[in-house]
Amino acid sequence: PAALLYAQMLQGCLREYAGLEVPFTRGKPRAGDAVLTVDTALPQNRYTLSIMPECITLKAGSDEALCNGVQTLCQYIEQHGAVLPALEIEDWPDLANRGYYQDCSRGRVPKLDYLKQVADILCRYKINQWQLYIEHTYLFRDLSEAWREDTPLTAQEIMELDDYCAARHIELVPSLSTFGHMYRILSTKTCCDLCELPDSEKIPFSYTYAGNHHTLNVSNPDALGFVKGLIDEYRPLFRSSK
């Protein structure tokens, strides 16, 4: 199943950058074919790419390495189109974790389709960890006062994005604040008692105010339970252990 997705990636790249509609199949290759294989004799994170007049051969030690090799081949097609200069590449990552951190709490809330496009870009550049930061931009079930004027990401969308990333060997990691950066939440009538600033919900909005007074009052005995509730709702949506 994984190889099918990578073949579709390559097929789409050839269509867009070389103007070629190339079908794919399984079985014994012929002259002129591009061949994708997992070779367990190679180290798990390594792939070799050979572009010769008679064929293109991509061998990888694992599905993840095969995916990375396809990204390299796609980059080469983007640069050269349908006429690819011959080359041989042996490649592997120097860093086990290659991460990207995205703040989804400022400005417009990204749609799922857009986030999938981001995942495709991260996959192209072999990024394998994506930390997704949210505040009021996730639909916490008991915090409708904080997100009702926005279009927050839902649990179903997060789980779908997690599956989409996993298929591209990207670990989607949950990220949320547990102390500060909670203006939209702590300025609601439901949660204002947890704010360090008394009567915070009565103060008109300003960016200075939002930046200075959006911190949990840690002396409030309910603060810890509140934070644990946020984590318990958001964390299970991800397959990541982080």
Q: What are these language model-derived features?
A:
Residues 95-242:
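Substrate-binding cleft of carbohydrate-active enzyme catalytic domains
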